Amino acid sequence: MSKSHAAYIDYALRRTTNMPVEMMGTDVVRLKDYQHFVARVFLGLDSMHSLLLFHETGVGKTMTTVYILKHLKDIYTNWAIILLVKKALIEDPWMNTILRYAPEITKDCIFINYDDQNFRNKFFTNIKTINSKSRICVIIDECHNFISKSLIKEDGKIRPTRSVYNFLSKTIALKNHKMICLSATPIVNSVQEFTMLVNLLRPGSLQHQSLFENKRLVDEKELVSKLGGLCSYIVNNEFSIFDDVEGSASFAKKTVLMRYVNMSKKQEEIYQKAKLAEIKTGISSFRILRRMATTFTFDSFPERQNRDPGEYAQEIATLYNDFKNSLRDREFSKSALDTFKKGELLKGDASAADISLFTELKEKSVKFIDVCLGILASHGKCLVFEPFVNQSGIEILLLYFKVFGISNIEFSSRTKDTRIKAVAEFNQESNTNGECIKTCVFSSSGGEGISFFSINDIFILDMTWNEASLRQIVGRAIRLNSHVLTPPERRYVNVHFIMARLSNGMPTVDEDLFEIIQSKSKEFVQLFRVFKHTSLEWIHANEKDFSPIDNESGWKTLVSRAIDLSSKKNITNKLIEGTNIWYSNSNRLMSINRGFKGVDGRVYDVDGNYLHDMPDNPVIKIHDGKLIYIF
């Protein structure tokens, strides 16, 4: 039915031919073609009640949305605008962008942060104050977070955000309101998030049905047919976060580097104690204690089970202060720092004080030592992602930075009052090469809504639970024109994944998480393809054979059709002759996968999903006695 959707897109564009391409307030900005396109379609179809902006980081989702809000009154006089956002993002980018380009809509805007514990009450209180003659436009920024907070927990408890989700899914279309959801990563943790998002945008269209069988979509054609026009899809980088990507005129080159570091005997001893503690307390599935132990270890492992919280906190504070005091008035000599900046380690002729300090620091954290050496050897500015703030996280890392003489800012929950200003200073043109501030270390608080410019190296000290979060992290530094001020030879970003291993080189929890991420991504890639093929851009570019229409009366019927996956008509069992193979998507063999090559040259993954045809002259490497095809 994409031809039908194409006809409505064409109708919307014909209705909005005179819509200005510039947005003017206290400042003026000219929209990119893709921004102007999606705004014209959404505003040109008044009965298009909802839309997902699946736009990668840095291409201007916020700007596109503000333009749409500015022109809402082109289609109706009275609007109330409700923006559901994280608290950290209200001032910047939202309020700043509105005040700069559409100050006249400020009086119509209501900001509510969905991470507020009173979110539900605040939302419905504001709904009651809206004039009955006004239409409502709801904006949900980083909608994957809103969806995640609306999922029913495993214990069956309904979360407060769910009532807002239910209200929006029932009311937006019914009352002729509008809604825009924004995300660069619309699916993060589970397939259920896709179902929730679809039913928010197209209420009731995707009922309780299994989307996958043996990790393959049951009926991709049915989903694409019924969900046409669901989203706008602007994703220039469709590669895995673990793949290298060549640069372009607008985007920096990305190179992924896996840095494997072996723990010291002392660190491994604490790691094993952390593993036992997880088993005893029943939290081994979360791997938190082991993840912390791979990052940094004190001289002893503080047991938490069956202890008074205050007593435990006091022990942690004592261990931290002891370590901090051990570094008082100690730092590396200029000679040692010069050696590190050349990418070299201390030699035998180094001072005893430098060697002793380096040995002590490395015994407690091979990761922190490695990241400090990497920063000093970097030719430009650096980002460091460390999800833990206290105990063995950022608080300790900053002590390492001090000893290594690394200037830095911190973006975390500890710096709420100063972090926006600090990032602005870090991004200043005068700091393009990191002369004033070399590094920004950030926690999960910095994964969304902020931009960094002229970054050359990103160090990821701990794996997240999903590729989407990693994509958000890396996307902070590789954005549209993020390196425009950087010298041409430094328009690149090296992404370093620092993976701890046991002292004998055996894997740790870091590689467990790496495998979990790869497993999840198999299903997500297929759902992202559905988003792409149901997008306004894809339909407009690929569907040309349609009959023009002169009204939008049939749009609601077109997008209200229920999705039926019960027939499973695209699942067929077929025996294929061929041979088992090994393959990798990386020249550095970061991950090696089992696959199958049919006699016809088609290559499949271990679950039978078709990948691509075997090249005429494939690249092959030998690793551990295996022939590895590089695709």
Swiss-Prot record:
Keywords: ATP-binding, Hydrolase, Late protein, Nucleotide-binding, Transcription. SUPFAM superfamilies: P-loop containing nucleoside triphosphate hydrolases. It comes from Vaccinia virus (strain Ankara) (VACV). Serves two roles in transcription; it acts in concert with viral termination factor/capping enzyme to catalyze release of UUUUUNU-containing nascent RNA from the elongation complex, and it acts by itself as a polymerase elongation factor to facilitate readthrough of intrinsic pause sites. Belongs to the helicase family. NPH I subfamily. It is an enzyme of class 3 (hydrolase). Residues 367-532 form the Helicase C-terminal domain. CDD domains: SF2_C. Residues 42-204 form the Helicase ATP-binding domain. InterPro entries: Helicase_ATP-bd, Helicase_C-like, NPHI_C, P-loop_NTPase, SNF2_N. It catalyses: a ribonucleoside 5'-triphosphate + H2O = a ribonucleoside 5'-diphosphate + phosphate + H(+). It comes from the Viruses. It holds the Pfam family NPHI_C. This is Nucleoside triphosphatase I. Its EC number is 3.6.1.15. Monomer. PANTHER family: SNF2/RAD54 HELICASE FAMILY. GO terms for biological process: DNA-templated transcription. A motif (DEXH box) lies at residues 141-144. ATP binds at residues 55-62.
